[in-house]
């Protein structure tokens, strides 16, 4: 619930007037990094109960990011005739999400070394 509320606040605070779904893209990329970093570093370093780790990872980060919004916004871009933007959005979301997850894991490894 808190993740979804934060997603909404970021969307209306920073990206309300944009035709391109910058809010969802930014949030999904940040969430990809955050979930990878949490699971590969924080949850190993800080002793949390499995229930609390799941609540933070799946609950907060899962509700912060959203695949359904990505899907709906992509279809809307196609329906509005913005085919190129729709394709760019999907590609950047997918490749960017994978890249940010990779960076999250990489940062956690570097932090663990030091």
UniProtKB/Swiss-Prot annotation:
| Annotated control of activity | Na(+) is not transported, but it plays an essential structural role and its presence is essential for fluoride channel function.
Q: Which GO terms describe its biological process?
A: cellular detoxification of fluoride
What's the protein's topology in the membrane? Multi-pass membrane protein
Q: Which InterPro entries match?
A: FluC
Which positions, given as ranges, span the membrane?
Answer: 23-43, 52-72, 84-104
Query: What keywords is this UniProt entry annotated with?
Result: Cell membrane, Ion channel, Ion transport, Membrane, Metal-binding, Sodium, Transmembrane, Transmembrane helix, Transport
Where does it primarily localize?
Answer: membrane
Q: Which reaction does it catalyse?
A: fluoride(in) = fluoride(out)
Q: Which GO terms describe its cellular component?
A: plasma membrane
Localization terms from the record: Cell membrane
Any one GO MF annotation of this record: metal ion binding
Q: Which domain of life is it from?
A: Bacteria
Q: Per its UniProt record, what PANTHER family does this chain match? A: FLUORIDE EXPORT PROTEIN 1-RELATED (PTHR28259:SF1)
Biological role stated in the UniProt entry: Fluoride-specific ion channel. Important for reducing fluoride concentration in the cell, thus reducing its toxicity.
Family that this chain belongs to = Belongs to the fluoride channel Fluc/FEX (TC 1.A.43) family.
This chain belongs to which protein, by name? Fluoride-specific ion channel FluC 1
Organism encoding this protein = Desulfitobacterium hafniense (strain Y51)
What gene is this protein translated from? fluC1
